[in-house]
């Protein structure tokens, strides 16, 4: 502590013996030892307190470093969360646009297709020609009442419009045309006619 060697201690002991004398020297030595012990204890306590303060300061610095890294990580997480939310919002907007586009396409297609079947007439509906028009007028049947349960219906026979020989349109049943006897007779060759 004081860097005092053996020769210096011997010199101090000789000076103390001469100054104090042999009677008071043991009492003075105890007193000096007590003060040296107290000084060492004070020095050790100050040293320990400085070390504790340095450790506390070091802990504070490390705590501040950890807090700074936590803030940085929190900022990165918020940025990542914001990016994910922006991406999700973008995907949601794209999905909504696709849904709207598909809905518009469906609306366009349904408005482009006719609602009634063209040129199909019901079996019991008479065809009426109005004077001065070439189009037949078919009365529109009243809508059928809504039934609580759906019942299967037999399909109605299909009718097509066939021009009559005198130029007006009439309704006839669709049938397969079988060749008539006169048509087959005229189409056979003279060699086949001989029995």
Swiss-Prot record:
Pfam (any one): TatA_B_E
Biased composition (Low complexity): 145-157, 175-195
Region named Disordered: 130-195
A Gene Ontology biological process term: protein transport by the Tat complex
A single GO molecular function term of this UniProt record: protein transmembrane transporter activity
Keyword Transport among record annotations: yes
GO cellular component: TAT protein transport complex
Disulfide bridge positions per record: none
Topology in membrane: Single-pass membrane protein
Record key words, sorted: Cell inner membrane, Cell membrane, Membrane, Protein transport, Translocation, Transmembrane, Transmembrane helix, Transport
Function: Part of the twin-arginine translocation (Tat) system that transports large folded proteins containing a characteristic twin-arginine motif in their signal peptide across membranes. Together with TatC, TatB is part of a receptor directly interacting with Tat signal peptides. TatB may form an oligomeric binding site that transiently accommodates folded Tat precursor proteins before their translocation.
Complex and partners: The Tat system comprises two distinct complexes: a TatABC complex, containing multiple copies of TatA, TatB and TatC subunits, and a separate TatA complex, containing only TatA subunits. Substrates initially bind to the TatABC complex, which probably triggers association of the separate TatA complex to form the active translocon.
Name of the protein this chain belongs to: Sec-independent protein translocase protein TatB
Species, as recorded: Xanthomonas campestris pv. campestris (strain ATCC 33913 / DSM 3586 / NCPPB 528 / LMG 568 / P 25)
């Amino acid at each position: 502590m004081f860097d005092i060697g053996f020769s210096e201690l011997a010199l101090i002991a000789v000076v103390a013996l001469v100054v104090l004398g042999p009677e008071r020297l043991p009492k003075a030595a105890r007193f000096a030892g007590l003060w040296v012990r107290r000084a060492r204890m004070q020095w050790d306590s100050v040293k320990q307190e400085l070390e504790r303060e340095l450790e506390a300061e070091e802990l504070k610095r490390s705590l501040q470093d950890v807090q700074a890294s936590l803030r940085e990580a929190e900022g990165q997480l918020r940025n990542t969360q914001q990016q994910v939310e922006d991406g999700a919002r973008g995907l949601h907007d794209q999905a909504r646009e696709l849904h709207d586009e598909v809905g518009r396409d469906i609306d366009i297609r349904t408005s482009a297709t006719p609602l009634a079947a063209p040129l199909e007439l019901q079996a019991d509906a008479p065809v009426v020609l109005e004077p001065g028009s070439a189009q037949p007028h078919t009365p529109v049947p009243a809508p059928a009442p809504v039934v609580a349960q759906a019942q299967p219906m037999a399909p109605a026979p299909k009718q097509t419009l066939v021009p009559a020989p005198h130029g007006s349109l009439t309704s006839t049943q669709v049938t397969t045309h079988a060749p008539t006897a006169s048509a087959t007779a005229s189409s056979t060759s003279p060699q086949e006619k001989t029995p």
